[in-house]
Amino acid sequence: MRVPFSWLKAYVPELESPEVLEERLAGLGFETDRIERVFPIPRGVVFARVLEAHPIPGTRLKRLVLDAGRTVEVVSGAENARKGIGVALALPGTELPGLGQKVGERVIQGVRSFGMALSPRELGVGEYGGGLLEFPEDALPPGTPLSEAWPEEVVLDLEVTPNRPDALGLLGLARDLHALGYALVEPEAALKAEALPLPFALKVEDPEGAPHFTLGYAFGLRVAPSPLWMQRALFAAGMRPINNVVDVTNYVMLERAQPMHAFDLRFVGEGIAVRRAREGERLKTLDGVERTLHPEDLVIAGWRGEESFPLGLAGVMGGAESEVREDTEAIALEVACFDPVSIRKTARRHGLRTEASHRFERGVDPLGQVPAQRRALSLLQALAGARVAEALLEAGSPKPPEAIPFRPEYANRLLGTSYPEAEQIAILKRLGCRVEGEGPTYRVTPPSHRLDLRLEEDLVEEVARIQGYETIPLALPAFFPAPDNRGVEAPYRKEQRLREVLSGLGFQEVYTYSFMDPEDARRFRLDPPRLLLLNPLAPEKAALRTHLFPGLVRVLKENLDLDRPERALLFEVGRVFREREETHLAGLLFGEGVGLPWAKERLSGYFLLKGYLEALFARLGLAFRVEAQAFPFLHPGVSGRVLVEGEEVGFLGALHPEIAQELELPPVHLFELRLPLPDKPLAFQDPSRHPAAFRDLAVVVPAPTPYGEVEALVREAAGPYLESLALFDLYQGPPLPEGHKSLAFHLRFRHPKRTLRDEEVEEAVSRVAEALRARGFGLRGLDTP
């Protein structure tokens, strides 16, 4: 979650600096992934009003006449370039962060363009480049440097734990900071409502899917660009401003972790219903995609008489037909509490992950809908000139939180502390809890937005969190003679040896959760997990994992989404939970030439990862081979089972292309092995003092032929003096026949007690050649280096 410092500071004015905020949030349990400075807007970018917009005949361009403190003309190809809006104008000579070059004065289609009217991407404030950045035409005096009203911002990229959905809103973070002692300024909802009848009705046909649903009414709207301060806040938080009505709904969502949606009343009909989708129903969502709805999808629908039609996917994304437009004058404002499981399934089913669905999947304040309505409607009054009806349509009776017994003495006993009773009670009150009673047992009712506070131990944890975990006294454990753990420690020593060897080969160790998303069983084509959690931290952590590799794939995807590394080489040793609990080792390779920056040739992922495993088992003194075998989650032509000392222990291959496509990943190669590995008695063998003989062999085989089949054939035919066999080249293309590939091997022969004669080596190579030809394979050549 992106947290703009200035926005949070509006609620917590005493915040000292972004660096102090990072430290405070870390103490509260929120890790900052990175701190980013955004909006370095050059002085040469000024505010300008569009006075005129004229199409240039024969082109898609427009000639804009601007007031930028003086009248100038620019040429723009943006579709939204029109009279009556404010724009960001880069004057000639300005170097733009989004372009990396200076803006000039040029003649385009016979028009001298004095600078450039900018999109968010060109200005460097957002990713959108399909149109001009729009402002209200009276936002600033023309010619004012935009940086004066849009100063640089500091944004903290925060990791919010699944048990704290309230912290997905800036107000939730502000409340936690208030518990530390900072003053809290709650945003006001200065609403001037009118006693008016509502022109629509509400029907909730699925109360389990929508336990609390509210509709507000605003009319007389003037849809326009949002003011600069709101656009700046939304861009900093990672969202694109649309117009003042839509922006208000997004702003309040980011403030309160409560998604909402505005429907243009012209397209609602007689009212709004909440129901399950009907078989075959279709809906064009705001992203422009026509979707076939599933009968389990929860939808917001309108109706006229007996006709009912979907308006949006509840809690996920609205429909394109009822979206707010420039000529929208009246809206129905939906603010609801939806069932998290239903929203998660709908979002996954349609491949949609939105800011709204993310929050609904975690859970929203069941009593927060009416305050969010008031806040949004008050902003619509202020920014869009709306008139607002006093009445709300409301369905459902949300259950208030229950009181929890709390004993300060028990908290100290559990934590090993001596926090004063009054101090503990004060902390709970600052967190928004209602505290009743005189002690020794108090009745504490948590605020409705704290869905994670259910037990007395939860309250104890809150006391420790706000006091600071560093205030808990350290105590050395009592000393007891160490038992004889040699038999128990042996597996751990072997695991540590694996870690050491893999780290030495260039792998990075990662640790992932022991939980998995049950939906990942479908996505990765695995058997359903056997062990489901009764009280999961989040829906995506509702089962105990059965494999390690999905966690590694998730780690890779998160890193690719963040900064797109060129290569990755990861491993994990951890527990999995099947019929019985097992320890596994899994590895992942992404990118070519991983760990070989000096190599002239880039090895393919499969053979590179196989080479790493060969090196691993050579260090461990264990025999290793791969035999072709299909696995549902691996590429049909790049998958095999791993055998160690002749015993099957796992798999190696490429992630199935269909899975990679669903996850929007490039090719990824994986292995996963069951531990402990088979044992082999260690025996010292004196290294041979006699020289080795080398031969290269290139075998032409049909493209579908598994590598393991060719390798096994060569090893069997070569005889006892073949010391090693290594693939060094894989080639397809001319002059090979179509549908064939060439596998080139290094063969190393050595006798343990004497020097091999050339004729012995040639005899072994001849046996290999005959065996290959007998199988129908061809040879490209025999070479002696």
UniProtKB/Swiss-Prot annotation:
It holds the Pfam family B3_4. GO terms for biological process: phenylalanyl-tRNA aminoacylation. Its EC number is 6.1.1.20. One of its GO terms (molecular function) is tRNA binding. Its main location: cytoplasm. Transmembrane segments: none annotated. SMART domains: B3_4 (SM00873), B5 (SM00874), FDX-ACB (SM00896). This is Phenylalanine--tRNA ligase beta subunit. Residues 39-147 form the tRNA-binding domain. Binds 2 magnesium ions per tetramer. The gene is pheT. It catalyses: tRNA(Phe) + L-phenylalanine + ATP = L-phenylalanyl-tRNA(Phe) + AMP + diphosphate + H(+). Belongs to the phenylalanyl-tRNA synthetase beta subunit family. Type 1 subfamily. It is found in: Cytoplasm. Tetramer of two alpha and two beta subunits. Its cofactor is Mg(2+). InterPro entries: aa-tRNA-synth_II/BPL/LPL, B3/B4_tRNA-bd, DNA-bd_dom_put_sf, Fdx_antiC-bd, Fdx_antiC-bd_sf, NA-bd_OB-fold, Phe-tRNA-ligase_IIc_bsu, Phe-tRNA-ligase_IIc_bsu_bact. One of its GO terms (cellular component) is phenylalanine-tRNA ligase complex. Residues 688-780 form the FDX-ACB domain. Keywords: Aminoacyl-tRNA synthetase, ATP-binding, Cytoplasm, Ligase, Magnesium, Metal-binding, Nucleotide-binding, Protein biosynthesis, RNA-binding, tRNA-binding. Mg(2+) binds at residues 452, 458, 461-462. Residues 399-474 form the B5 domain.
